UniProtKB/Swiss-Prot annotation:
One of its GO terms (molecular function) is carboxyl- or carbamoyltransferase activity. It catalyses: N(6)-carboxybiotinyl-L-lysyl-[protein] + acetyl-CoA = N(6)-biotinyl-L-lysyl-[protein] + malonyl-CoA. Its main location: cytoplasm. Keywords: ATP-binding, Cytoplasm, Fatty acid biosynthesis, Fatty acid metabolism, Lipid biosynthesis, Lipid metabolism, Nucleotide-binding, Transferase. Acetyl-CoA carboxylase is a heterohexamer composed of biotin carboxyl carrier protein (AccB), biotin carboxylase (AccC) and two subunits each of ACCase subunit alpha (AccA) and ACCase subunit beta (AccD). GO terms for biological process: fatty acid biosynthetic process; malonyl-CoA biosynthetic process. Pfam families: ACCA. Signal peptide: none annotated. It is an enzyme of class 2 (transferase). Pathway: Lipid metabolism; malonyl-CoA biosynthesis; malonyl-CoA from acetyl-CoA: step 1/1. It is found in: Cytoplasm. This is Acetyl-coenzyme A carboxylase carboxyl transferase subunit alpha.
Length: 274
């Protein structure tokens, strides 16, 4: 990633970025599917329990390339947020996503994921249906999937709920998105027993796209319109399409075994210190 570009990004505090990432008008995963791809056909269900509306997935066309596209999505209003469980998937959502990814592998389609979730749903029903095993199985299967995977964090990337769709060859992240093991509120409550220290927690956690790019956890920071993606959603679509095409071009000539080995090495290196 170009260091001068990173420096040119409008500087906001980590907590300000959290607030922008959570903004009620921020474009959703569904919005990006509708505006970036053509001929989207949605598939439903995990073939085990039901259809989780927090996860949208199907096949589509991107620049005349057939792709599988999956999004963990919030709603654009209160009613949609209730329908989509505020972007918190149940186990059947992760199993649906994996079903579509395995189908993409079978038909040699690249997989493109959009991530916007505060985390996996932690209700009793979700736990009874195997939330932990659903996420763990995704991590395992994505690590060896024989087709390119590109994941884009567009808002909140919360904990294992986000990681379940970000074991990818290329991880892109919007300028004001955040990606972390838990929320700043949760971090402050656990570490300091004081949920009011959220701004301090956000600083300590290194959750911004710029920090994560510097650490090598993500590959590309996608610039946003001044003030955030919600200020000019169509401009944001254009910026995402450009970086998505760049990522796909980088992946198209990589041999399958090399791709899987590089994906494995990418995640094994996370957390190493020089």
């Amino acid at each position: 990633m170009n260091k001068e570009f990173i420096k040119s990004i409008v500087v906001s505090s980590p907590w300000e970025k959290v607030e922008i990432a959570r903004h009620k008008d921020r474009p959703t995963g569904k919005y990006y599917i509708d505006n970036i791809f053509k001929d989207f056909i949605e598939f439903h269900g995990d073939r085990l329990f039901g259809d989780d509306k927090a996860v949208i997935g199907g096949i589509a066309s991107f620049e005349d390339i057939s792709v599988t596209v999956i999004a963990i999505t919030k709603g654009a209003n209160t009613n949609e947020n209730i329908e989509r469980n505020f972007g918190m998937p149940n186990p059947e959502g992760y199993r649906k996503a994996l079903r579509l990814m395995k189908q993409a592998e079978k038909f040699n389609r690249p997989v493109i994921c959009f991530i916007d979730t505060p985390g996996a749903f932690c209700g009793v029903g979700a736990e009874e249906r195997g939330q932990g095993s659903a996420i763990a199985n995704n991590l395992f299967e994505l690590s060896r999937l024989k087709t390119p995977i590109i994941s884009i964090v567009i808002g909140e990337g919360g904990s294992g709920g986000a990681l379940a769709l970000t074991v990818a060859d290329k991880i892109l992240m919007l300028e004001n998105a955040v990606y972390s093991i838990l929320s700043p509120e949760g971090f402050a409550s656990i570490l300091w027993k004081d949920s009011k220290r959220v701004k301090e927690a956000a600083n300590v956690m290194k959750i911004t796209a710029q920090d994560l790019n510097e650490f090598g956890i993500i590959d590309t920071v996608i610039k946003e319109p001044r003030g955030g993606a919600h200020k000019n959603p169509q401009k944001q679509v254009t910026l995402i399409k450009k970086e998505l095409m760049n990522a796909m071009n980088e992946m198209k000539n990589i041999e399958t075994n090399q791709m899987i080995n590089e994906r494995y090495d990418k995640f094994r290196k996370i957390g190493t210190l020089e």
